[in-house]
């Protein structure tokens, strides 16, 4: 029952060529620090007292809305603690510098090609909010577990997998009693893909993923900053990304923006979204490489923003595996670097992590696009931020770009 699993180190450590430095660095430091201690510490009276403290009702309740991955990304203090450099710094260096593209080193640490060997029943799942880590692995595993005797999926809403993960204990008990003790627990009743749509009520079911009732609608990235199925006047918009070491004390008021946003008009009715998402980006860049980081957002009537999902791409790794790709779900091999043709229009097919959400009437859908998300002002799901590509450029986005959203009609 690998809930919130990870199966491919490349997908965990980098996002289509962009190192997930906000997570992988403190994570490896934390593992290095904790692995250096024996059971003398972990079974000590001090740790027993801490466990007892966490089980007190008032403190325990606070963990109902905790997210372990976000906590790790925020623990900057870990970077100052001592840890054994072998193998943890070796692994960090391999991810950050030695293997920028998917190669044999990464493939040796990829379990996805082995999943079709699994024949036992498997129950997988995740919460929709775990966009930069566990969520994409869940769907990759679903595609590969083709020989499992019984494959079942649960896609949960916010805090559906609260740390320390108590929300699925009853479900797990029913699952294991069914298969290990032969008891009829009802866990197998109904369709095998079960999900919630955040902001909507109740559980839903499907016999397939993607959900067949959802169809892709193409939204143009209009020159006026709106997001609409009608492109309107053809044109473009430009934003600027600056690399490091420029010795500039502050931005200038004449600078182009560091990001672009496109927003739909207020929705006249609830809009349910579920499935794979793709940005078909047409852009020109004066540098040989850049990055595109996009965040899909829910904007309410008061202007409050909820980050829904995100997509990432190092432009030089844009090559699409057409045979493996589907409409709305491009597959990027990330094995071959191809420099951007300077100043020319290039079409990028960028996968955005599949997701689900009800955008309520009166709300708007917004797409935020930038190149560097290291700034605290830049939206980042779970605070997973990325190492910069390092180039400075003016990136021009054409209105012929399209955002493909899977809408339940």
Question: Where are each of the predicted segments found?
Answer:
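Structural recognition of the beta-strand scaffold that forms the well-ordered cores
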Residues: 1-2, 123, 150-154
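Accessory cap/linker subdomain of secreted extracellular hydrolases
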Residues: 1-117
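Residues that line or immediately flank small-molecule/substrate-binding pockets and catalytic motifs
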Residues: 4, 156, 223
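Short beta-strand/loop motif that positions the catalytic acidic residue
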Residues: 118, 124-126
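Acidic beta-to-alpha connecting loop that harbors the catalytic carboxylate
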Residues: 128-130, 156-158, 372
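Conserved alpha/beta-hydrolase "acid-adjacent" motif
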Residues: 131-137
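Glycine/threonine-rich phosphate-binding loop and adjacent beta-strand/alpha-helix elements that clamp
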Residues: 144, 168-170, 180-409
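Catalytic histidine neighborhood in serine/cysteine hydrolases
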Residues: 145-159
